[in-house]
Amino acid sequence: EKAPLKQARLIHDWVRTHMHRDDSVIGCGTGDVGEILKSGKLGGKCTDINSVFVALCRAAGIPAREMFGIRLGASRKLAQYSKGAFGSADTNGVAKISGAQHCRAMFWLAGYGWLPADPADVTKMRLAEKKENGNPDVEAVNEYLFGNIEMNWVGFNHGRDFALSPQAEQGDINNFGYPYAEVDGDPVN
């Protein structure tokens, strides 16, 4: 396939089909594609899974990037498929944002600009609802998350490997999916 949109779709479908969400991974994962592929364990959380999508798009010549942000409440569009996989809120509709960090992917399509893709959320829904690929709900979520963003999410940045000044004790910061602070040279967790 030579058309970039179709290539990106094939990559999205491959990633959501062959990768799995691993809830034992800390935070959103590190997005270390080399390590994921070398280990042969095609799993992780949103940064890991969407970083594989980004890497495969780039390998096919499609500009792509991760986008780090946070969910600001319960999903309206996708809640019919999963009550917890796409954000949450209390009974008054107030967002539960502790742990709501989420990495999405974006790819560039000439004439359109940056388009969203989120195979990681397909794997999250699959695990949360104990459904397999091919299930109509999984397929509906997959269809929506290629080219759409649920409007309960806001992106903050798309950077990786930040070199802070003064330099962080741990060296470059992988991403700003979470706040980072140090006190007297010690990272605050």
Predicted regions mapped to residue ranges:
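Active-site rim recognition segments
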Residues: A74, L78, G84-N189
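Active-site-proximal, glycine-rich beta->alpha crossover segments in alpha/beta enzymes
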Residues: E1
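Active-site neighborhood of thiol-dependent amide/isopeptide-bond enzymes
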Residues: P4-K6, W14-C103, M125-A128
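Acidic/charged, solvent-exposed loop-and-adjacent secondary-structure segments enriched in E/D, K/R, S/T
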Residues: I11
